[in-house]
A protein has these predicted regions:
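Extreme N-terminal leader/targeting segments of oxidoreductases
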Residues: 1-39
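N-terminal Rossmann-like FAD-binding beta1-loop-alpha1 element of flavoenzymes
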Residues: 37-64
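Glycine-rich FAD pyrophosphate-binding loop
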Residues: 57-77
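Short, surface-exposed loop/turn segments at secondary-structure boundaries that line and modulate
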Residues: 79-84
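Dinucleotide-binding Rossmann-like beta1-alpha1 core, especially the glycine-rich loop
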Residues: 85-168
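Flexible hinge/switch segments at interdomain interfaces of large molecular machines
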Residues: 168-177
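Residue-level detector of conserved catalytic or cofactor/ligand-binding positions
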Residues: 189-198
Length: 199
């Protein structure tokens, strides 16, 4: 487990557990002159870094610009959840994008986790990775939605184990009995968010 040095500086990042426990981060040169590249990616968060990697793999020359530090913005300030989805129930978007659009959003969420999983593996990134995540239901209606979510994952061919947790069993999973149930997904994780954007 990565141990924080909470008395130290935030390495040029916003103060957080992740910045305090990241150790020293390398500096990068400022842009000078008039460099030329096939593509200029602006923003060094997870999306920008991944875009630059993918383009370079396809043989394009890439310049990656970041105003502060790699991983400084939203990518360096989240809670470290490596989870599928967009923070909302995607079924609510059906009236805008139709059922095929909802299916696409669900698959995109799954694929995004797989991309990060591949990057962590191929670059041997030490990010305190621990597979297994439990979504928590505050109401019986949310727990029922988890049941529908699990069914949807099966239809999408999701390859990781999932398990519904009944309300009476939540104490065993999260040491609390206040929740109305949960959905454990072994394909999701928490990560140390400062590490995946290191060189």
């Amino acid at each position: 487990m990565i141990q924080p040095n909470l008395s130290g500086s935030a390495n040029g990042h916003a103060r957080s557990y992740y910045a305090a426990s990241a150790g020293s981060l390398p500096g990068y040169p400022s842009l000078e002159g008039q460099p030329s590249a096939d593509v200029c990616v602006i923003g060094g968060g997870f999306t920008g870094v991944n875009t630059a990697i993918e383009l370079a793999r396809r043989g394009l020359s890439v310049i990656l610009l970041e105003a502060r530090r790699i991983g400084w913005g939203a990518s360096g300030r989240n809670g470290g959840q490596l989870i599928r989805g967009i923070g909302h129930e995607v079924t609510g978007f059906a009236r805008y994008v139709g059922q095929e659009g909802v299916k696409y959003l669900e698959q995109a969420g799954i694929d995004s986790v797989e991309v990060v999983r591949q990057r962590i593996s191929e670059h041997a990134i030490d990010c305190d990775l621990r597979w297994g995540f439990c979504e928590l239901a505050n109401t019986p209606a949310q727990f029922a939605a988890f049941q529908a979510e699990q069914d949807s994952l099966v239809r999408l061919g999701y390859r990781h184990p999932t398990r519904l947790v009944a309300p009476q069993d939540m104490q065993q999973v999260v040491a609390s009995s206040v929740y109305a149930g949960g959905l454990v997904d072994m394909g999701l994780s928490l990560i140390h968010i400062s590490e995946p954007t290191r060189p």
